[in-house]
């Protein structure tokens, strides 16, 4: 749409008659299939499952354009993966470089902190190895929906990682 792209031009009828028009809409469910195939970070997928409205945002403000796109989420995912390998933490300012909508960037950065907390608290490596404590199940039983969904997505993400490693062998 022209409001998102200044290089968009109106074509005359002769030109329009010779080209094919493809309307593209932001669709999280379609992107999610792609995301699983390319290994988007589980924290990104988990967050977007909870906050689908933040998948694609475009706003004009007095301070300029604020936006979040699928490309931004994918690039942020790659950065998170690199930071994890280096043992570095992703903070709000870094997130905002990829998600150029301050409210969404702040919300995701807060979610990422919770995600890491759940990762440590629930001992997902041990759960996947078949070992878990009774209190872990009790804690999950009484956890909020968001927390349970995050833990499920953590497990799914770790399993996807293990399957990928197995395929590469």
What function would you assign to each model-found segment?
Residues 1-6:
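Sensor-1/coupling segment of RecA-like P-loop NTPase cores
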Residues 8-29:
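A short helix-turn-beta junction within AAA+ P-loop NTPase domains corresponding to the substrate/partner-engaging
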Residues 37-168:
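Alpha-helical lid/collar subdomain of P-loop NTPases
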């Amino acid at each position: 749409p022209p409001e998102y792209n200044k290089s968009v031009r109106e074509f005359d009828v002769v030109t329009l008659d010779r080209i094919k028009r493809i309307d593209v809409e932001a669709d999280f469910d379609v992107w999610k299939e792609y995301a699983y195939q390319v290994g988007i970070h589980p924290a990104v997928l988990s967050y977007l499952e909870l906050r689908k409205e933040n998948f694609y945002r475009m706003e004009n403000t007095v301070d300029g354009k604020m936006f979040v796109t699928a490309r931004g989420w994918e690039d942020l995912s790659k950065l998170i993966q690199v930071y994890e390998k280096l043992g570095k933490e992703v903070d709000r300012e870094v997130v905002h470089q990829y998600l150029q909508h301050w409210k969404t960037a702040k919300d995701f950065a807060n979610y990422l902190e919770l995600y890491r907390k759940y990762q440590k608290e629930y001992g997902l490596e041990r759960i996947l190895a078949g070992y878990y404590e009774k209190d872990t199940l009790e804690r999950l039983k009484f956890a909020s929906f968001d927390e349970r969904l995050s833990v499920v997505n953590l497990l799914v993400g770790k399993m996807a990682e293990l399957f990928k490693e197995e395929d590469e062998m």
